Amino acid sequence: MKKVFYTFAGTVGVIAALGGSLAVWVSSQGRDDGATGRPSYGAYTFPKGAPRGGPIPRADGYVEGSQGSKFILPVMPPERAMDVHTAGSVVRNNEIRTCFWPGPKLRPGFYSTDPDGYGVENQLPDTMNTFTTAWFRIPEGAQIVMKGEYPHERHWSFTTYSTNGVPRDSIDDVQIDPDSGSQNPFREGVRRDVMPRRYTISIANGEPPAVRPPNTVYTLAPASAEVGMHMRNYVPDRSIDYLGAVSLPEVELHYADGRVLKGEDACSATAAPLRGKQVPLAVNPKVWQALTKLPWMNPAVGPAHAFESEPMEMFFNREYLMLKTFFPIRAFDNFAVQKGGFWSNRSTRYGYKYLSQEHGKVYAMRGKMPRTPRTWDGNPSPVSQDVDMRYWSICSAMAPPTGMTVDCVFDEGVVPLLDEKGYFTVVVSRAGDRPANATEKCGVAWLEWGNGDGIPGGSSDYGLIINRHTTVNPQFKYSWFAVTTPGRETSAMGAYAPQVINFHEKQRFEALGCPVDTAKIDKMPAQLAVQ
């Protein structure tokens, strides 16, 4: 065991040294290659602009942030009927904030075009989920107490984090006991429109005790340490606002001696350096670029490889992802442990696949759709417990160093498009390469690919797709939670593992007609392999 450890430590040391040297070299070569090979788009925000402002992107998306960061922003995807954030709602949503909760944040263009500003979520967000992020320090012996109403939405949770984005502790909607006389609308048999619906949650320093008190989230850090906490709000009913038609939780600071601070006083007593500011990037863009220039990598293509049909891959943790991406050595599979990263949360597991325009301009994802609730229209009936999971989505995204999402589709928008077998078909391409039959009318959901990795001087061909499974029913055995070994995605998930099929050009997909002949898609991999 020691020999293995020292071998690994030595390998990591060499990798770090090599990566550091290359990073210095790349920095010295830095230039703005943003326009090279990247498509130009007309819109990087809503028509009236982002409510928090920011720089005006160039035609290819290039911007310089308020702190000097340089990125290529993702194009604004077409607005859908079931979008949480629309041109008509973002200004109203932006006003929902307090001294403790700095307001909503999402991918660039929705609330800001400043990649260095709080309003941009830079950790590959799902666009059907709105983040509001609190940073705080809790004094010795004190607790933060939050009071509010359960929201009218699909899923809701609180997760604490380290300053580098590793999830620590969390509590989900169904776990939160209601106040006396109230009911929790996420629980079995309780109507979703029930009133009253109040709750109280505490945030405490340190580790949870052996017998954990109810409604308590822990920092897993010592007193006065800086801690972050995401409040996630998935799919509010009818998108009335990002909080699901309730107010932000009221915050109090309770000291051990009985003193209680509220409002601005509580905010001042818990102030932290990162409050209201952008969180640090999980991966340094210069290091990423350096790694793509390793001898066995193709900088133009990035981490993608050529394939005709393969399953999406399990995301285990940030460290293993970087090792697998740039140093695909099987020995590193020992580090494939489900612990998350990139500000992930414990209720969700993720699948992903790197793509490249160099290998194909049109890809299709196929798989069996898990059963999920229907809540968008404000269905007042109790949340169905007889489902496979609470939430499902597929998103297109840019590279981890920028952490920018391009586009997303979620379960309620995809279910009406399923074929007779209950399988979904999601196509990702650039708008100019979109097949004429990649439409809802033809039974297909479509995602905008975007304009590369988001890094000036990086890859204009880069693509990434991400599949989320959130709050999975323990009785459902075919989710991303079931994947414990790299390369065993299909054996663990069966038909629910999304297969990614490379159509190369839009004409091949258009040949499937309208409605799309999905039986031909399922036979396609073998046919493509011999062409």
Locate predicted features.
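N-terminal Sec-pathway targeting helices
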Residues: 1-14
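Prokaryotic Sec-type signal peptides and long signal-anchor helices
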Residues: 9-12, 26, 507
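Membrane-interface motif at the C-terminal end of an N-terminal transmembrane signal
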Residues: 19-39
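A compositional/structural signature for long, glycine/proline-rich flexible linkers
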Residues: 34-531
